[in-house]
Amino acid sequence: MKTTNKWVIKPDISEEVYTDREHHLNYFYQAALRAATRRTTSTVLFGQRRMGKTEIFKRVVNRLFFEQDPKDPKAVVPVYYSFPDGPLDTNTFAKQYLENFIRYYIGFYTSQPNLIADKIEGDELLEVMESSRSLFPFTRMFDRIIRWHDAIVRRKEPLCHALALEIPRKVSDVDDTTIAMFIDEFQNTRLPQYNFEIVGFMQNAVESPTCPHFVTGSAMSILSKELIGRGSLYGRFMAETIKPMTHFWGACLARKSADFYNATISEEMAAVLSHKCGGNPFYINAVIKQSQLLQKPLLDEATINDVLAVDLSSGFIWGELNDQVNRWITRINDQNITKWVLYLSALDENTNQERRGELKLENIQKTIEHHEGKVVSIKEIFDVLVKLSRGDLVEYLEMGRWFRRVDDPILLEFLKVWGQFDVKGKSIDTIQYDLRKKYQTLSRQIHNYKGYLAEIHMSQILWNGQRKKLPKEWFHHEEDILLPDFIFIYNRRRLSSGKGKEIDVLAASGGEVWVCQSKWVVGSKIGIDVFKQLQDQADAVNTEMEPIKLRMWLFAHDGLTQSAETYAREHQILWSTRSEMDQLLDHLGLRQLPDI
């Protein structure tokens, strides 16, 4: 479609900063295009909050809108809709849903993106439709859409929301066209403000081969357990999962963000920041922006800790998570008890190996009694935790009927700060002082920054090289190396048995395991002792994981001593120098190791 516009729904993240979501962008773009051949199934995108799910949907919709010819019989009409958080009645919802669909459908076929961008509605939308009648290819459907609008808006047809939900499929079926519905904030359909059924009326719509529905939202527990995982929509969706960024891409984002916001971060600290933020792009950007506001270059770990402490207690992270937590708590009746339970859940440091992070409800009960002077029953605490789990603030393992803390270190740190302020009533100044003092005394999480940089590059080579043959010369091996399809690739991993030292990179496919070590040593070659350490780690992995095949790979910046080369050859250990690592990275389209 020829236009100077680049979007019909504005992305939230600038191109200069947007990083590493190509897999998901291509996945949904191609899935939408395949719908024209009737080979696409409705799909749900799972992932923690602030991972970029909404941004992916917006960018795919924009791309579909502008990169297709609407005159092509196989063109796919993209439609984006986000379920609002506020209260709606059935007629208001039905009108919003239908008019949103009309804007995209008519706008696409008549090459009028302004219909969507300007959010034209009501009588004005109908007037624009009539004036565009000659541009629209399906005259019969054009009139039918107007009649449906009249039924919903003027005649207030009973169950008008059910009609609105079915219309996209009806249109695609009658015209034999293809429509791709991108539905955001789907969990809102389960909230109290929607006092009418949504999900039950979507069953027929999402089964359509002509109109697949791609859905996501910000409360994964509701999506997976209540909407997609049971009831009328069970079994009707495929699943795609978005995970935190690898630290290779997290470091890349940190550098891009620093350039964009005129902040400063070193190569080594970009990787450290990603590590501390758990690869969450929102947290990474927040710390970068806060460092610019404070005029503090991120050149060492202590400064990152200090800036993170500021942002957790009064900055971008505080603002986002405080809004998220308080909005969810307002939906629960006894807010005072709920706040106590949530705060205490973040403090529980249970390190039991079998059920790590399990919350002890008895401890929560005793602490509330101590501070509030009343006994809250275990059942009431249990019920509150179930409600909190629906907002992804704790994790509920439903089959075992137990709870554990969420796997989000930054959110847990925030809850500790939030609880001091909102539950215990401490002044924000005191909280900020205590937190910054605590963070300034934290020990270094990473002691060899250069070695860690090499580790995250090794990990990314494994990710990007999956199912590919890599030249043997770069591994000093007799045959080319075919990388498997990995299930996981971990950095800095200890075996549960506790045997052996921390493994720099541990990766596993179905039956193949890789044990990797990084030695960024400049000016001298690596000797046999390092290989013996690597062999000890591999032996421990063999004992615990019992792989069918085990590979060892060492990064040695300046190479090996002659005796170490012999040892590596005899024990079939792969190894790569700085030059060979750079060639691997370049071969896979990745940024080479930085010059430090």
Regions found by a protein language model. Name each.
Residues 319-321, 409-442:
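Short, amphipathic alpha-helical interaction segments positioned at domain boundaries
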Residues 498-500, 508-514, 518-580, 584-585:
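Catalytic cores of nucleic-acid endonucleases
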Residues 285-376:
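Winged-helix-like regulatory helical subdomains adjacent to P-loop NTPase cores
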Residues 173-182, 188-194, 201-230, 242:
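Sensor-1/coupling segment of RecA-like P-loop NTPase cores
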Residues 371-392:
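Short amphipathic alpha-helical interaction segments
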